[in-house]
């Protein structure tokens, strides 16, 4: 389950007898009920986002969700027809699975996410990711560098900032280190999701199970941004 110590549901159930509530719901029954309540978890997450104070800035990025070791990329059959092979530039790694695209505030609150096959380019998901976004300034990495995308987003009321490549005119002036540092905070959030919730590893074998896991992790992550009285 999503906790700083327990990232395995099996491990959680193995110590269930330590809780004062006594007998826990049987695992398969718990999972069936949880999947039936995906809509509720999603509703709570979106309602929480509406409660956030207005902010001008948000950050977009993606991370890999591999389903097997690279050596099995061309033999994997899990999620056949849905997952595929993609390349992760930051890790210099080809992987089979999905890609998770996220929209995050500067403070680290996850506003939205989209899961796609691994081969889908980041630019293809931007409009879906920004659906309902109240932030007007969007920071992205070189994967979002596109004059056409920038122009189209400006017509939608968004200002997209990405760094320039080093060989581009005006790159040294444009690539302000303060803005670059703000953009990199999303990488810190991804590291936290991996460390606390093991988000890059999943044993689920169904789309409903994958969606439930993502919704649970994001909800647990976002809850800490609200003062619980």
Predicted regions and their residues:
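Short alpha-helical elements
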Residues: 1-229
